[in-house]
UniProtKB/Swiss-Prot annotation:
It comes from the Bacteria. Produces ATP from ADP in the presence of a proton gradient across the membrane. The gamma chain is believed to be important in regulating ATPase activity and the flow of protons through the CF(0) complex. Gene3D superfamilies: 3.40.1380.10, ATP synthase, gamma subunit, helix hairpin domain. Its main location: membrane. F-type ATPases have 2 components, CF(1) - the catalytic core - and CF(0) - the membrane proton channel. CF(1) has five subunits: alpha(3), beta(3), gamma(1), delta(1), epsilon(1). CF(0) has three main subunits: a, b and c. This is ATP synthase gamma chain. One of its GO terms (molecular function) is ATP binding. GO terms for cellular component: plasma membrane; proton-transporting ATP synthase complex. PANTHER family: ATP SYNTHASE GAMMA CHAIN, ATP SYNTHASE SUBUNIT GAMMA, MITOCHONDRIAL.
Length: 292
C-alpha cells in the first residue's frame, strides 16, 4: 500500500504530464489546420498533373516514350520510398505506413525480387531497420526542416531519378499516409516509376479533348514526368504532415483524458487512505482517553 506522500507525489506527477499532453494537443490542433489546408491545396494540382500526363501519354508509344514512363521493361529490382514522421507520440500513424511497406517488401522478397528502401522520416527508418537493415539504401533527414517546401520534395525526386538512370532499380513505389480526417489517415502505396498513365481517375479527368502539342508529346513528357515525380512526393509529404498532426492531436487528447481518469482514481485512493488514517488516530485517542 503506497503511503500518502507517495500518492501525493504520483498525483502531482500525473497532473504535470496532463499539462504537457494538453499543451501538445493544442499545438497539434493549431498546426493541423495549416497542414490540412496545404494538403488540400496540393491535391488538385497533383491530380491535374496526372491527368495532363495521362492525356499526353496516349499520343506517345514505342521508342518515343520516355524511360521514366515505360520503365526498364523488367520487374526485378524494386525501390520503396517510405515517408513517415520525424517524431513519435502520434498513435499508430508511423507504424501503419511502415507495416504497409513491410508487407509489400516481404511479398516482393517472397517472389524473388530485389528490394531497396529509401526512408523519409526517422520513425519509419527505426521501424524498418529492425527487419530490413540490409535493404536500407538511403535516408532523408527532415528533422531540421521547419516548413516543408517543394524544394525538399524536388531533392528527393532528383535522387530517385538519378538512381533510375544509373540502373539501380526497375520499379519505384511511394508509401505515405493520405489524410482523410483527424481520426482517419489511410496508408497508401503509389507507383512513381514507371509512371502510371492508366489510372482510371486520371483518364476520366483527362477527357476526350484533342490537343496539339508544341514541342512534340515525347519532349513534353521528358520534362513533365520528372516534375510530376517531385509533385507527387511533395503531396505525399504534405498529406503526411496533416495526418501526423491529426493523429498526434487524437493521441494527446486520449492521453489527457486518461491522465484525468488516473488523477481521479489516485485522488479517491488518497482520500480513502487519509480518511482511514484519521479514523485510526481518532480511535487511538479515544482508547487512550478511556484508559485514563
Amino acid at each position: 500500500m503506497p503511503s500518502l506522500k507517495d500518492l501525493r507525489n504520483r498525483i502531482a506527477s500525473v497532473k504535470a504530464t496532463q499539462k504537457i499532453t494538453k499543451a501538445m494537443q493544442m499545438v497539434a490542433a493549431a498546426k493541423l489546420r495549416r497542414a490540412q489546408e496545404a494538403a488540400e491545396a496540393a491535391r488538385p494540382y497533383s491530380q491535374r498533373m496526372g491527368a495532363v500526363l495521362a492525356n499526353i501519354a496516349q499520343n506517345v508509344s514505342g521508342e518515343d516514350a520516355p524511360a521514366l514512363m515505360v520503365g526498364t521493361g523488367k520487374d526485378d529490382v524494386h525501390l520503396l520510398v517510405v515517408c513517415t514522421a520525424e517524431r513519435g507520440l502520434c498513435g499508430g500513424f508511423n507504424s501503419q505506413i511502415a507495416r504497409l511497406a513491410r508487407d509489400h517488401a516481404r511479398k516482393l522478397l517472397a517472389e524473388g525480387k530485389t528490394v531497396k528502401i529509401i526512408t523519409v522520416g526517422k520513425k519509419g527508418a527505426d521501424i524498418l531497420r529492425r527487419e530490413f537493415s540490409a535493404l536500407l539504401h538511403d535516408h532523408v533527414d527532415l528533422r531540421e526542416v521547419k516548413q516543408l517546401a517543394f524544394v525538399h520534395a524536388d531533392q528527393i525526386g532528383h535522387k530517385i531519378i538519378k538512381l533510375f538512370e544509373e540502373g539501380a532499380f526497375d520499379v519505384c513505389t511511394l508509401f505515405y499516409s493520405e489524410f482523410k480526417s483527424v481520426i482517419s489517415q489511410v496508408p497508401t502505396a503509389q507507383q512513381l516509376i514507371p509512371a502510371s498513365a492508366d489510372n482510371e481517375a486520371e483518364m476520366e479527368t483527362a477527357g476526350d479533348a484533342i490537343y496539339e502539342y508544341e514541342p512534340d508529346p515525347a519532349a513534353i513528357l521528358s520534362t513533365l514526368i520528372p516534375r510530376n515525380i517531385s509533385v507527387q512526393i511533395f503531396r505525399a509529404l504534405l498529406e503526411n504532415v496533416a495526418g501526423e498532426m491529426g493523429a498526434k492531436m487524437s493521441a494527446m487528447d486520449n492521453a489527457t483524458r486518461n491522465a484525468g481518469d488516473m488523477i481521479n482514481k489516485l485522488s479517491i485512493t488518497y482520500n480513502r487512505q487519509r480518511q482511514a488514517q484519521i479514523t485510526k488516530e481518532l480511535i487511538e485517542i479515544i482508547s487512550g482517553a478511556e484508559a485514563l
